[in-house]
């Protein structure tokens, strides 16, 4: 009979199937809407009425049988695929693991943290302040007159007439003196901004500025502090000298050089005794209190410490350069 022929063909083909694509082709050929088993049901109209029930029953039994065999084959193929996937995912624990490249601190950050540790060990507090400053905190309170070139738009990043990106961290000293009574000893690390960009200048760089206010402080205290810093930062052989200079907020003012073996004398920072006008601006009595201040560019210190010639290397994000320090 035709039913037995379809059954034999289906079972034979199903036994040879080995992948999902062949299984889908089988389903369409035998179990689909236009498949061979569905086609058997179309023969009902050609049979005598009394034979139709038995014939229909036989066709339905065949469909159920083939569907069961089909599902078993599908599960068998699925198990094989899962096993193959597991084999591919198998981990050989004897194979050496891949070495991860660990990140580390940027050389500028490393130097800034070292500067902080040195001054904290000498009794200074670390104080921070806003990077957007008023012109009063950034210039006026620091005895910087309106005609001073540092206040020009060509040198500073103004946001409004009264607000700008701070050009140094000295405003933190002003804010601290307004909030605290002397004596105080602080350093203020952070980002500062100036319109300058070349091999030795960046428009955004880092500074650490220091302030010590107490009774009877002198240039001798300032020099001792800077000598101790240089010795700890650059080694026991480092020497310090002070050259006369001018800053609006200190009087007297000095450029500070450090002597490094193999390099000679190199300028590293500016310093001086706090100008009495600055004390008056924050409500300190200059007849009672004296103080010294200093400020250094962290990138400058890092360049000297690591022998880096171009300051722009710090912001080029070259992993080969950064991983060397």
Swiss-Prot record:
Keywords: Aminoacyl-tRNA synthetase, ATP-binding, Cytoplasm, Ligase, Magnesium, Metal-binding, Nucleotide-binding, Protein biosynthesis. It is found in: Cytoplasm. It catalyses: tRNA(Phe) + L-phenylalanine + ATP = L-phenylalanyl-tRNA(Phe) + AMP + diphosphate + H(+). The keyword Transport does not apply. Coiled coil: none annotated. GO terms for molecular function: ATP binding; magnesium ion binding; phenylalanine-tRNA ligase activity; tRNA binding. Pfam families: Phe_tRNA-synt_N, tRNA-synt_2d. Binds 2 magnesium ions per tetramer. One of its GO terms (biological process) is phenylalanyl-tRNA aminoacylation. Tetramer of two alpha and two beta subunits. Belongs to the class-II aminoacyl-tRNA synthetase family. Phe-tRNA synthetase alpha subunit type 1 subfamily. This is Phenylalanine--tRNA ligase alpha subunit. It comes from Thermotoga maritima (strain ATCC 43589 / DSM 3109 / JCM 10099 / NBRC 100826 / MSB8). The gene is pheS.
